[in-house]
Every structure is written in structure tokens, then in C-alpha cells.
A protein has these predicted regions:
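Metal/cofactor- and membrane transport-associated sequence elements
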Residues: 1-92
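Reverse-transcriptase-like RNA-dependent polymerase core
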Residues: 1-13, 31, 40, 55-56, ...
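A short acidic-Thr-Gly-centered motif at the start of a beta-strand
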Residues: 5-10, 52-58, 213-221, 292-297
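C-terminal reverse transcriptase regions that engage the nucleic-acid substrate
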Residues: 19, 67, 94-214, 349, ...
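Mobile genetic element proteins and their domesticated derivatives, centered on retroelements
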Residues: 21, 33, 37, 51, ...
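Alpha-helical coiled-coil heptad-repeat oligomerization segments
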Residues: 38-39, 78-85, 89, 153, ...
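RNase H-like nuclease module associated with reverse transcription
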Residues: 101, 224, 242, 254, ...
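Two-metal-ion RNase H-like nuclease active-site motif
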Residues: 167, 225-237
């Protein structure tokens, strides 16, 4: 990028400030914005650098920024107008009114409920795959699906595969029910096979019948943190690594979920489950710290439900075991949180282990039962079809 000066063909210009399009521009904009909002009395969150918190007496405001898209929520309209005036005086910006659309996510408010959906984005994925007339299926992955890197012949359009797999990853922001299936196909993005493509098409066929579903957030009287965690054991046919998954509820609302292949091989099912417990406890620590910054501290221990008795025993019993001494770091981390009263690890029967949906393919009845527990609903009547 640039031009050649006729009189000084061997000279270069010194850049005095960042220009739009340069790789340094996003960082420069972020620093410029941060410096200004700090002068308004905001504090930058240590848990999330894109979150700014304003708390003075009875006035509270939260500001979330992603590049140049901003969400601002305040405790009063007076405070909102004051902050908007200050921001508009410093930066060229437009007030789009109440939150209705952010980063591809449609937001609808009805009474005391928020409905978050990416239904239009889901339909776009179906169209990009050329599957607008496909027949829907009841589940995104079959019960026997264990994809291998050697599954059949090479797929002839890896670019399309990667594009759709990446799009499905973004869709999991409001669709926790597909995260396990998406995680399984994304593992093979580097060298997709025909079987991997068939697995991806099954996810799209599932979306064909469920694209209307979205995430609901209700006003809740409870401020308790509750989590479910589960893991398969040596589920990957190539690496023999396990897949762990969890979901976290704040009151009655689902706020966090994950499905990931573990980074090491577990020597027992208890070890695989315990590593899953450590993962969700780490997430709970982050959420508790975030709530503390938001001036909403929790006073009660967060509950973690696990269906493996041995993993529960390890979390609270300070005994050294020959078979678990190699996972000492995770053991000490979880035990420390338990001893501090921050976390309690309790047993749940496997039939009611919601996190199963994040670690394996399930039969239709069980899948739909667990899906109904993930805050996924049809849109309110006034927004159906949007």
C-alpha cells in the first residue's frame, strides 16, 4: 500500500497516526476508545477486556464493545442519555435504540424474557450448502458416530467444508444443542473426508427442522450458579483422547457451555471425568469473578453435578492415589475450590446428566429431553418467522 514520489523515489513517509486498514488500526482504535471511557468513570473489567463497568452510588452502567459495535445498558434513562451524549461528542456514532441485533444475533424482548436467535443465519447456512429442500432429521449426530481421520475417501471440496464448518461454529453461540456434532466435524477441517462431509450434512438436515429455535433468558429470582459436567472415555478412534463437556446455569438460565476434546489421554474413566470437573470449575471461577466485578457477588457455593462416583470422591477426599498422582495439578485445583467453599461437587444419575448431550450422540427421546433443558425454545408468537 502506498505511492512513489516522483522527486523522492527512494524515500518513505513516516506514519504519524494509524490509518484504517493497517494491521495496527484495531489496536489503536481500542486504546483510543478505552482511554476515553476511563475518563468518564468507567473501569475496565479484568475478566473481559471488552467490558467496561460504571458504578457510582445508585448509578450503574455496563458497556460492551466488539470492534466498533457497542452495547450499553444502564440503571436509568438519565444515565444512558448522559453517557450517550459524552460518547457522541467524542466519536461519530449512531444510536440504534433498544438492542435488537448484535453480531448476527437477533434479540427480542417480551416482558421479562429475552429471546436470542440466529435463525436467519441458520437458513443462510442451509442455502450455502445447497440443501434448501433436504429432509430434516431429529438429531444432529447419530448414536454410533465416531469420526476418524481415515474415514473414507478425500472430500473433493475442502474449501466448502471449512466454510460451512466455521459457520456452524458461529451458530453454536445460540445453539448449544449442536456443539458436540460441530466439534466433531471441525476436528477434521484440515483434511476432510467424505464421511466427515456426510456428518456435516446431517447437522444441516437437523437445522432444516429446527432453525427457528433460539436461546431464552428469563428474569430469575435465583442467583445461584449450577453446572453439569460429563466426559466420554477414549472416544477419539485416532488419538484415544476423551471428550468433555459442560453447561452452566445462572439461576434458571443457561449462560455457558462447552464440548472439547481433552488434550491428554486419560488412563481411566474417572480421570477423564475428573478432568471435565476441573474444566467446569475453572469456568465457574471466571464467572464468579465476573459477577464480583459487576457488583453482584455470590455468597453460596456453586454446585457441580457429575455422574462418576470416583471423580466426586477425588474432589473432596485429600488422599494420594497411585492411579491419579499424575493428574495432581487438576486435583489440587478442584480440591482447593471445594475447601474454600466456592464449589461443591455432587452426584447426579446418568439418566439426568444434561451434559451427556455435549459428549456423545444420543437417541432421539433422550436428546430432545436434554435439549429442552438447555433454554432452547421456539420464538415468541409476535416474532415467529423473523
Amino acid at each position: 500500500m502506498g505511492f512513489r514520489h516522483r522527486e523522492y523515489p527512494d524515500h518513505v513517509c513516516r506514519l504519524r497516526k494509524s490509518l484504517y486498514g493497517l494491521k495496527q488500526a484495531p489496536r489503536a482504535w481500542y486504546q483510543r476508545f478505552t482511554d476515553f471511557v476511563l475518563t468518564l468513570g468507567f473501569c475496565q473489567s479484568r475478566c473481559d477486556n471488552s467490558l467496561f463497568i460504571y458504578h457510582h452510588g445508585a448509578d450503574t452502567a455496563y458497556l460492551l464493545i466488539y470492534v466498533d459495535d457497542i452495547i450499553l445498558t444502564t440503571s436509568s434513562d438519565r444515565l444512558r442519555q448522559s453517557l450517550m451524549g459524552s460518547l457522541s461528542g467524542e466519536f461519530a456514532m449512531k444510536d440504534l435504540g433498544p438492542l435488537s441485533y448484535f453480531l448476527g444475533i437477533s434479540v427480542t424482548r417480551t416482558g421479562d424474557q429475552l429471546f436470542l436467535t440466529q435463525s436467519a443465519y441458520a437458513r443462510d447456512i442451509i442455502e450455502r450448502a445447497g440443501m434448501l429442500t433436504c429432509n430434516p432429521v431429529a438429531t444432529p449426530v447419530d448414536t454410533n458416530s465416531k469420526l476418524s481421520m481415515d474415514s473414507g475417501a478425500d472430500f473433493d471440496n475442502p474449501t466448502l467444508f471449512r466454510s460451512l464448518a466455521g459457520a456452524l461454529q458461529y451458530l453454536t453461540f445460540t445453539r448449544p444443542d449442536i456443539i458436540y456434532a460441530v466439534q466433531q466435524v471441525c476436528i477434521h477441517m484440515h483434511a476432510p473426508k467424505v464421511d466427515h462431509w456426510n456428518a456435516l450434512k446431517r447437522i444441516i438436515r437437523y437445522l432444516q427442522g429446527t432453525s427457528h429455535l433460539g436461546l431464552t433468558i428469563d428474569r430469575s429470582t435465583s442467583s445461584a450458579l449450577l453446572a453439569y459436567t460429563d466426559a466420554d472415555w477414549v472416544g477419539c478412534p485416532d488419538t484415544r483422547r476423551s471428550t468433555s463437556g459442560y453447561c452452566v446455569y445462572f439461576g434458571s438460565n443457561l449462560i455457558s457451555w462447552s464440548s472439547k476434546r481433552q488434550t491428554t489421554i486419560s488412563r481411566s474413566s474417572a480421570e477423564a471425568e475428573y478432568r471435565g470437573v476441573a474444566n467446569v470449575v475453572a469456568e465457574l471461577c471466571w464467572i464468579r469473578n465476573l459477577l464480583l466485578e459487576l457488583h453482584r457477588p455470590l455468597t453460596r457455593a456453586s454446585i457441580v453435578y457429575c455422574d462418576n462416583i470416583s471423580a466426586i470422591y477425588l474432589s473432596g477426599n485429600p488422599v494420594q492415589h497411585q492411579r491419579t498422582k499424575h493428574i495432581e495439578l487438576d486435583i489440587h485445583f478442584v480440591r482447593e475450590q471445594v475447601q474454600r467453599g466456592m464449589v461443591r461437587v455432587l452426584h447426579v444419575p446418568s439418566r439426568f446428566q444434561i451434559a451427556d448431550i455435549f459428549t456423545k450422540g444420543l437417541p432421539r427421546v433422550l436428546f430432545e429431553d436434554f435439549r429442552s433443558s438447555l433454554s432452547l425454545r421456539s420464538p415468541p408468537a409476535s416474532t415467529a418467522g423473523v
